[in-house]
Design a protein with these regions (language model features):
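Short beta-strand-centered aromatic/proline hotspots
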Residues: 21-35
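Hydrophobic beta-strand residues in large extracellular and virion-surface proteins
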Residues: 12, 28, 40-42, 59
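Short, solvent-exposed secondary-structure boundary/capping segments
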Residues: 36-46
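Intrinsically disordered, low-complexity, charged/polar segments
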Residues: 46-64
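A short, compositionally biased
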Residues: 6-8, 34-38
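Mixed-charge, Lys/Arg-rich low-complexity intrinsically disordered regions
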Residues: 1-11
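Short, surface-exposed secondary-structure boundary micro-motifs
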Residues: 15-17
Length: 64
């Protein structure tokens, strides 16, 4: 999964720095994020936990 895969959908996450304003699938549920724009955001996507790490722009599946 790449950053470009996060473009479609209706759930809006406005706190990703240069990705501010980007739309992601509405099935993604925000779990947590770092207000200083460093750290990660974790989503649950169709039963899988996906983490977006920033500012290094890495996305990977995680198990929480």
């Amino acid at each position: 999964m790449k950053i470009k895969d996060l473009k479609k959908g209706k759930f809006f996450k406005p706190h990703l720095g240069k990705y501010e304003g980007q739309w992601v699938p509405p099935t993604w549920q925000k779990i947590e994020y770092d207000r200083k724009k460093r750290g990660w955001i974790c989503y649950e996507v169709e039963g899988k936990r996906i983490a977006y790490f920033y500012p290094q722009e890495e996305i990977k599946e995680v198990y929480l």
